[in-house]
């Protein structure tokens, strides 16, 4: 749905849960996903098998457990969410052909529901930052936690965490048993700032170049007061919150890779060191996924092979130069980052998904490595840019 830009004010609402008026039955697996427990532990608490259905009293018992943890629905809304899911009509599914070497324009949270099971060997993406950029063609989604906003423009950092985890929940059924998810996400600080159109605009402003704008001249501003615990200027720890909750969804957290950038955006250093890292969360749906560590040594560095300055082993520390961010999208996602993720986790001919395709970097890497791909992006503008970049990469192979 269309989105009217609004300021980001990270207030924490006071919940007033209503526990009466629910009479549905809910699959145990669905309840496990929103209570942060394994299906076997849920069964142990309520005294039922994993194939059983649960009622409202069972859910209330689970919400009273010390083991309860929020995943992507706040505690006060869980019964409402489960009721809505049980009444939800089935959606038409896409075919494998519909998903092969295709760019799909739409919301990832909607498109993922329509995709076939177990088709992707690798899912790799770089998500938006929380409340730091305005993208083209932004559309609002209505999320499981009740918030209506574009992904990345939530009112609180935990809203962004919940929405990230909701997308991971919806993506899980599409991943093959030995497949991998590589989820690149950057952290941010709970600070009063402007939400700009791109990184170049931010850099020009820091250098005093371009049009000078005051605080009130920006279309969207981010405030820092009103949160239940985050103080002004405090790091939000978003990648680690997503990682913890992904484990509660049933993913295996295989590693949290530190992407060290050889150069990064300048930042004020009045009270802290400058950031030069992001994180790549490696998730799987079984204990032992496919892993081709030889790719690190054999592949060219431009596609994800070892850089001259990197260690002689494939570790959880990757030192890669960020992209210059040219073009309409302006992301810092370099070709060798998705290239490495794809190369170590898949084989030629396998299918790769990027649910936030942007300018098409993941598909370009997949194409050059002989993999097939699916891209999703909510922006028709970025989808066209991605298709141009992918077409150029494909033509260069012949």
Model regions and ranges:
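A detector of low-complexity, intrinsically disordered, Ser/Thr/Gly/Pro/Ala-rich segments
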Residues: 2, 33-36, 51
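A detector for short, charged/polar N-terminal pre-domain segments
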Residues: 2-23, 89-100
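Short hydrophobic transmembrane-like helices used for membrane targeting/insertion
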Residues: 6-8, 42, 46, 390
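Short helix-start
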Residues: 10, 20-25, 29, 48-86
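Core catalytic lobe of class I
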Residues: 30-32, 36, 40-44, 64, ...
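The DNA-recognition helices of helix-turn-helix-type DNA-binding domains
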Residues: 49-52, 359, 369, 390-393
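Cysteine-dependent PTP/DSP-like catalytic domain, specifically the C-terminal lobe
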Residues: 381-398
């Amino acid at each position: 749905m269309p989105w009217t830009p609004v300021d980001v004010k990270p207030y924490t609402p006071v919940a007033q849960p209503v526990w009466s008026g629910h009479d549905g039955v809910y699959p145990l697996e669905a309840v496990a996903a929103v209570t942060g427990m394994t299906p076997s532990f849920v069964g142990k608490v309520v005294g039922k098998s994993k194939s059983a259905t649960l009622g409202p009293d069972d859910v209330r018992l689970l919400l009273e457990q010390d083991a309860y943890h929020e995943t992507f629905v706040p505690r006060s809304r869980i019964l409402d969410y489960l009721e809505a899911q049980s009444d939800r009509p089935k959606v038409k599914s896409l075919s494998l052909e519909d998903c092969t070497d295709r760019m799909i324009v739409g919301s990832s949270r909607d498109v993922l529901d329509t995709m076939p099971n177990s088709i992707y060997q690798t899912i790799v993406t770089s998500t938006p930052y929380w409340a730091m950029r305005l993208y083209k063609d932004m559309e609002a989604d209505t999320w499981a936690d009740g918030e209506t906003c574009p992904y990345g423009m939530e009112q609180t950092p935990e809203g962004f965490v919940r929405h990230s985890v909701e997308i991971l929940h919806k993506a899980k059924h599409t991943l093959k048993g030995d497949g991998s998810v590589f989820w690149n996400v950057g952290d941010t600080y709970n600070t009063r700032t402007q939400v700009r159109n791109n990184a170049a605009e931010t850099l020009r402003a820091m250098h005093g170049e371009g049009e000078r704008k005051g605080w009130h001249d920006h279309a969207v501003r981010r405030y820092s007061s009103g949160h239940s615990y985050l103080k002004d200027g405090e790091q939000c720890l978003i990648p680690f919150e997503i990682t913890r909750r992904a484990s509660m969804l049933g993913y295996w957290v295989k590693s949290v890779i530190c992407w060290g950038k050889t150069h990064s955006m300048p930042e004020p250093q009045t009270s802290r060191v400058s950031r030069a890292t992001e994180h790549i969360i490696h998730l799987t749906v079984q204990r032992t996924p496919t892993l081709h560590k030889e790719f690190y040594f054999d592949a060219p560095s431009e596609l994800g092979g070892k850089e001259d300055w990197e260690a002689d082993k494939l570790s959880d520390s990757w030192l890669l130069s960020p992209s210059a961010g040219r073009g309409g999208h302006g992301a810092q996602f370099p070709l060798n980052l998705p290239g490495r993720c794809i190369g170590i986790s898949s084989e030629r001919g396998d299918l790769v998904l990027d649910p936030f395709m942007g300018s098409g970097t993941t598909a370009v890497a997949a194409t050059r490595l002989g993999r097939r791909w699916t891209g999703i992006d909510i922006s028709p503008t970025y989808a066209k840019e991605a298709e141009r970049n992918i077409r150029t990469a494909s033509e260069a192979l012949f």
